[in-house]
């Protein structure tokens, strides 16, 4: 069972943050997480982020603990 994302954000908020950031890797992370919020698979999120499933899992854990920063 995948780790669920925190409920105080949504896909559109993360996409807006991704558009505003000047940090390319952060934008990819945010877009990958937005895809998960939209119901996409972790595999699809990994493709968007250009990373492995383990990295996506790490992103989810960090995002749940610290938010989008």
Residue ranges and their predicted role:
Residues 1-69:
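Short, basic alpha-helical/linker "hinge" immediately adjacent to a nucleic-acid-recognition surface
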